[in-house]
Amino acid sequence: MLIPTQIKSLRQYFYPCLGGILGGISVSTHFWLIFMPISLFILWKGSERRIANFCWGFFFILISHSWLYDLHPLTWLGFSWLASLIIAILILLFCAFLGGILVYLWGLLVEIILWKEDVFKMKILSLTVKVFFLSLTWGIGELILSQTPFFWIGLGESLIPGDIYLAGLARWIGASGLCVLQILIGFWIFYIQGRWERKLYFKKIFLLGLLVFIFLHLFGGLTTPIKRNYEYPVAIWQTNIPTREKLKINDEFIEEKLSIAQKYALSNKAKLLVAPEGTLSNNFYFSKGIKVNTLSGGFRNSNNELRSSLLGFQIGDKSFTSFIDKNRLVPIGEKIPRFLDIFSRGLSAVGGIQPGSDSRFFDPKFTPPLAVAICYEISDGLEIRKAINSGAKLIITAANLDPYPTKLYNQFLSLARLRSIENKKDNLLVSNTGPSGLVKDDGKIIQLLELNVEQNKIVFPNFSSDKTFYTKFGDKPILFLFILFMGLNLFWKIN
């Protein structure tokens, strides 16, 4: 039988783990509205205990990134079944451990700034300054991480489809601002519960917070719709060719399939055909000239280096005449350290590829200017924003998401929808096994193809020059607030 001290000790471990699990489950799901606030409440409640912070971060990443396990089996790349299983599990555990360490470090900052005295006896002004600074620190942390290849999705991008109205604030504050808001909401719940538990007055704080919460949703839901037109029909080709089968497919097969897609595009008077990432092999050459302007994922050589690119073909072309190379590569999966080149080609079918320019602006001349995200690059909102500031009128996202499960598809869709909201731009999606379709400039889905089915479809994207507050100013307001609140914490004696 457990004694009371053992039960208390178990609770100290159990609740942070539960909080991380609930948060991980809520990412890019309809559970967000219930699970994420509870998860962040648990995070704040245990934030004075270092191991609690680590446990929360570890399980948050373990659950939200559990799709990494679906790398297994890698037997098609020459690994044994056991080696494949070990590799997949180790990659997932490493990412979870890294998440735990990052939340642990944030918890140390919370301990230094917040837990030197009783939070529930602090003056409101002092408490507000401290909590805003800690929340902004998390938001800035995600912003910095998003500029590295080790970031996929964080709190900032997690709330679609769970709360599309709160996500609407992204047109003002971006993903990092949404992240800050979520941390603040978690603290508000923690603070109310703590005051209630201590039999302290809390109704005014509860009502004020509730009014702010409602206002944020109303403000996030406000949008000026852009009149839709049907002047630029685009054909999208969801190939449904799994990555593991690409090694068995020759160029003649792809050319035949692409010919069918072109006929479909022409019969529907499409001005452009778009195909997913990695559709065309290196130096692909058509035996006959292309019949419709085409953007297709594929590979090309540059200075004896292999690049994954979106290749542009004008009518009559037999080989590409324009391109934009993928810049953000999946560590180990696509990009391996040069000193390991002789030992491995990485965990991909094509071997290690090299990155291109970091600019996501692409003007193939036969379409209006575009902001292009190739798969993993959809997580980099800063570069997409820069491309739109350079004149891009539409976001095109080409991806290759097989063999991963629906969880990754949902996260990819959540990221794509947030990029649309941030910049008030339609986002045309085309993936080998899905998701493919069209996302409206307010993040709502206009059309989405069925997963894991080969399909050709006509969509009508809007090309728009409109810019949001976030597009114009980016994360500068969040950085300004971070510096302001850091200064207040360091130099202003507010207790």
Predicted stretch roles:
Residues 2-223, 405-406, 431-433, 446, ...:
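Membrane-embedded alpha-helical bundles of multi-pass enzymes
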